[in-house]
Amino acid sequence: MGRKGYSDGSGIQVGTMTVRAFEPKPMRLSLLTAALQELTPRAQRDADPDLAIEEWLQFARELDCPAIQLSAALHPSQADVPAEALLDPVANHLDLRAPFDRNRARRILAAIGATGVALSDIAYFDNMLVADPDARQRKHEFMLRVFDTAALLGVDAVCGFVGRNAELEMDQNLDLFEEEFIPLLKEAKARGLTYRVEQCPMPGWVVTDRWHNN
């Protein structure tokens, strides 16, 4: 009697089909900048949008940390979350109120070269399926700008949430995921990026808590 599945070294044989063997890849150790939002005070980073990145790279170097996970977010003036609902409004260390062009990229790449600290990925943690269609569109447009920035900086991955529409049942959310989120994944792939899903059901995605980290 033949075996249903076996490995010949190059893959797993299932019947007449060969499934490629899993090849684990090491994860780069990095420090999420959102963990310390006020390393560069907001007033300073609002005035100089790239200062926070430079200071985070230097801080990581002092900690002997090889990389940072750079946090991006809509600026408090553009976000759908009331300021009073958050301790520090938003960890937008990557500030994209103005276009992230090649001049800005050169400045950050120079800081990376000077410190020897890399960017593991860019993180934009937001509810990409939020119920309000205008807010959802604004978040999707911002995510596309994050993708473009990652590509310009030579970063190969973006990390973020999927989210949930708290006004819909789960089956409806799955439909919304296919309609709204899959196109974002295709945009990431078109730029040569991997989208890393942060598996984290935030409290703000339930009907009893509309705002906390939503």
Where are these regions (language model features)?
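N-terminal pre-domain/capping segments
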Residues: I12-D156, D171-D175, E179-I182, K189
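Residue-identity detector for glycine
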Residues: G2-G5, G9-G11, G15
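Distinct, well-ordered alpha-helical segments
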Residues: D171-E178, P201-N214
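Glycine-centered flexibility motif
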Residues: K4, S30, G160-G163
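Active-site groove signature of glycoside hydrolases
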Residues: A150-M170, R191-G204
